[in-house]
Amino acid sequence: MKTLGEFIVEKQHEFSHATGELTALLSAIKLGAKIIHRDINKAGLVDILGASGAENVQGEVQQKLDLFANEKLKAALRARDIVAGIASEEEDEIVVFEGCEHAKYVVLMDPLDGSSNIDVNVSVGTIFSIYRRVTPVGTPVTEEDFLQPGNKQVAAGYVVYGSSTMLVYTTGCGVHAFTYDPSLGVFCLCQERMRFPEKGNTYSINEGNYIKFPQGVKKYIKYCQEEDKATQRPYTSRYIGSLVADFHRNLLKGGIYLYPSTASHPEGKLRLLYECNPMAFLAEQAGGKASDGKERILDIIPESLHQRRSFFVGNNHMVEDVENFIKAFPDA
C-alpha cells in the first residue's frame, strides 16, 4: 500500500526543477482536505450547515461550510511558508501571505464546490490549482501571478467527499487517485494514470434550464436522447449538481459534463480560474477534452479573478460533438 506522501516523493524526480517545495505544498493541501473531511462528517452536529447570511463577490449566498473550508485550507497553506498567496472563490481579492515573498507558488481554489448539496448529504468537493508565480521572487505577489492561462498550471486536483473521500491530482504526468483511510489518517493510492474510457455514454447537465440554453446545446441534448445503435445512443442522463462529483463519475464511467451559457449568465456560470482550468488540466491528462464550446479552456487568457465561462468537459468525442453542434446552430 502506497500513501500519497510516498507517491509524491517518488514522483518528485519527474521535475528537473523540483526542490521539494511543490511536494510540501501538495502535503499542505492534503492536510486541509483531512480537516475538511473530518468536519463535513460531523457538520450536522456542530452548527456549520446552512447559509451563513453573507454573500461572496459574485452575489451568491455563502454556506457556513464554504467559509469554514476556505479558512481551514487557507490556514494549512499559510502554515508551510511555501505559498506566496492564494485566490479563492470565497475571497473578493487575492490574499497575499506576508513573510512568504520568497515562495515560488500561488494557489487558486474552490474550497467547497457544490456546498448547497451538503444539507442533503450529497457529495461535495474541493478544487485546487497551482501556478509558478511570474513576478520576481522576493517581492509580494500581485494579481498578475494569478491571471495566467490554464496551460501554465504546475499541478491541479480535487478532493471528493462522498461515500469515501478521494484526492485526485495531476502534475502534468498523468492523473492519480488516492482514497482516504480514516483509521490510519492517510490517503492511499487506489488508481494510477487514470484515463477516460474510450467511449462515453453519459451526459451531465441541469436540464431544468433547457429553455435558456443556446440552440446548439439544445440540439446536442436531443442528439443524446435519440436512439441509434451505431453510436450507442440514447445516452444516459446523470446530474448530481456538484462539478467534482459529476466530473469524477464521468472520468470513471465515461461521459461529458456541460454547463453552457444562459440568458442570465451569457458568459457562463462556472469560474474559469477556480473550476474550469483545474478540471480541464485533469481532463486532458486523462485523455479527455475541455472547451467553452469554441475554444480550448486551457488557452483562454484570464481577464479577472472571478471570470466565468461556459464549460464542456469529458470524453474527447463527446466534447467535439457538442462543439460541432454549437458551430452548426449559432444563436441569432
UniProtKB/Swiss-Prot annotation:
Enzyme class, first EC level, given as a word: hydrolase
UniProt pathway: Carbohydrate biosynthesis; gluconeogenesis
CDD domains attached to this UniProt entry: FBPase
Keyword Hydrolase attributed: yes
Sites where the protein binds Mg(2+) 2: D110, D113, E275
GO molecular-function term, one example from the UniProt record: fructose 1,6-bisphosphate 1-phosphatase activity
Residues involved in substrate binding: D113, G114, S115, S116, N206, Y239, Y257, L258, Y259, K269
GO biological process, alphabetically ordered: fructose 1,6-bisphosphate metabolic process; fructose 6-phosphate metabolic process; fructose metabolic process; gluconeogenesis; sucrose biosynthetic process
GO cellular component: cytosol
SUPFAM superfamilies: Carbohydrate phosphatase (SSF56655)
Cofactor: Mg(2+)
Residues given in the record as Mg(2+) 1 binding sites: E89, D110, L112
Keywords: Carbohydrate metabolism, Cytoplasm, Hydrolase, Magnesium, Metal-binding
Cofactor: binding comment: Binds 2 magnesium ions per subunit.
InterPro entries with a match to the protein in the record: FBPase_C_dom, FBPase_class-1, FBPase_N, FBPtase, Fructose_bisphosphatase_AS
EC number(s) recorded for this UniProt protein: 3.1.3.11
Pfam families: FBPase, FBPase_C
Record's catalysed reaction(s): beta-D-fructose 1,6-bisphosphate + H2O = beta-D-fructose 6-phosphate + phosphate
Subcellular localization: Cytoplasm
Complex formation: Homotetramer.
Family per similarity comment: Belongs to the FBPase class 1 family.
Protein's name in the database: Fructose-1,6-bisphosphatase class 1
Organism: Klebsiella pneumoniae subsp. pneumoniae (strain ATCC 700721 / MGH 78578)
